[in-house]
Amino acid sequence: MRGQRSLLLGPARLCLRLLLLLGYRRRCPPLLRGLVQRWRYGKVCLRSLLYNSFGGSDTAVDAAFEPVYWLVDNVIRWFGVVFVVLVIVLTGSIVAIAYLCVLPLILRTYSVPRLCWHFFYSHWNLILIVFHYYQAITTPPGYPPQGRNDIATVSICKKCIYPKPARTHHCSICNRCVLKMDHHCPWLNNCVGHYNHRYFFSFCFFMTLGCVYCSYGSWDLFREAYAAIEKMKQLDKNKLQAVANQTYHQTPPPTFSFRERMTHKSLVYLWFLCSSVALALGALTVWHAVLISRGETSIERHINKKERRRLQAKGRVFRNPYNYGCLDNWKVFLGVDTGRHWLTRVLLPSSHLPHGNGMSWEPPPWVTAHSASVMAV
């Protein structure tokens, strides 16, 4: 803040000094002398209200954009409910189309083993999507306890003015600190943190699988429906011409029923929606998978990137203290302790708690010795 004020007041201060050097007090008219006095008085008043020796350009920018930050935070907070309803409505529409439009078609064409496979896989995928989305919305991400002095803290939150454990960050939308905060997700209307990070990623992963399954499985139906829609457009065009030219005894051209029209349009809608979501959400899922493999969150990636550059300039190597190795990172993230847990905790709905309490980050006992040595560096 002080740097910006000096930049703005520099030319005015230079003019005042020139006037002093030229002896303005004897030669300048009283009007100019009064303006100079008012300028000095205004500068003293401004400094008495705004001057802060601890401030800087970053403080000035934050203060200037504070109304914008407040508007964005409050808009996202209210739009989160709209986004959650939108996800539920769109997902429900795909399920309804699958039962009302796709199922009657495949019952007439698919064999019994193929029908059984699609039946079990689609319902397994749907159950996992619904379970993880519900858990991601309703599970609190985890907050540091207030009033306790026995927790290991790294710094003090500038917003909450409370001790902040490692990997904890302040969410301006929720207006509180979150343990192992990854980001605030408007599609969940919730922060993604220590206790619901697994639910968020699992929802993204299984939703991507479901969209890819629907897009690939309905490709033939989509092509037939798209061709039928084009044929409907041509028939409607020919019908208008025939009505204009037909005689009283001529039969009007055949047309599609309302149910056939809605079925074809629904199949096209299903394919386009699932394909677009598969691409967008698939890219997001891959990105978070890379971060999990590195033992980072979205926020920590930017922090570690700056720290890596700072240490590289000093000729030193940065090591992420929370990186146990790719496989062990996934075990910690998914809460997998034994081989059986890959089935019961990953491929089936499970509400088990993650490792640790989100405030201290000691390596689990089954982490390899190499990972433990990395933690000690």
From Swiss-Prot:
Which residues catalyse the reaction? C185 (s-palmitoyl cysteine intermediate)
Name the GO cellular-component terms. Answer: endoplasmic reticulum membrane; Golgi apparatus
Q: Which GO terms describe its biological process?
A: apoptotic process; DNA damage response; eye development; fibroblast growth factor receptor signaling pathway involved in forebrain neuron fate commitment; heart development; protein palmitoylation; telencephalon development
- The record lists the membrane-crossing segments as 78-98, 117-137, 199-219, 267-287
Q: In which tissues is it expressed?
A: Widely expressed.
Reaction catalysis annotation? L-cysteinyl-[protein] + hexadecanoyl-CoA = S-hexadecanoyl-L-cysteinyl-[protein] + CoA
Cytoplasmic compartment spans? 1-77, 138-198, 288-377
Annotated DHHC domain ranges read: 155-205
One GO MF term attached to the UniProt entry:
protein-cysteine S-palmitoyltransferase activity
Where is this gene product found? Endoplasmic reticulum membrane
Quaternary state and interactors: Interacts with ABL1. Interacts with COPS5/JAB1.
Protein name per its UniProtKB record:
Palmitoyltransferase ZDHHC16
Q: Which gene encodes it?
A: ZDHHC16
